[in-house]
Amino acid sequence: MQEKMKRQLGFSLVEVLIALIVMSVGMLGIAGLYVQSLQAGRTSMFRHQAVALASDVADRIRANPTAGVSYADASGADNGCVAAGNDCDAASMALHDVFLWKQQAGNSLPGSAATGGGDVTIGFDDTVTPPLYTITVSWEEPGITALDAAPSYVVTIPVNPF
């Protein structure tokens, strides 16, 4: 009986070490899943912001349908249209709308170091009846190094102004 006990000395310690290794691998897996869920949540938040920005400018286009191509031609610079005492025509209001919209996109969406924020564009197709606007919001996912292929996301929404 004593011979049997001598052969088993230290065996329970080996069992504990193996269990500890298995638990460690499991905990690392859980931590990896947690990090991925955080990244997915952040990407989802940016997509939501992009859709909200596109919907906002789509509503502005529908509210000002006579501005026509002014929305697509806007540079994004402030024209001072809404300053006290100024009268704004439809084209000037469109320029101001795009200025505000680009500011919001730059502040709420991530971009590359060169852009400083997300990029937004409005396309205008007057070859179809009624004319069609295409709103595009794009951004780069943060936390990606230059060596990796930085994923770029684009949300495009067609808008019929009438």
Regions found by a protein language model. Give the residues of each.
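Aliphatic-rich helix starts adjacent to a transmembrane/signal segment
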Residues: 2-55
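Flexible, low-complexity segments enriched in proline/glycine/serine and punctuated by aromatic residues
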Residues: 39-45, 52-162
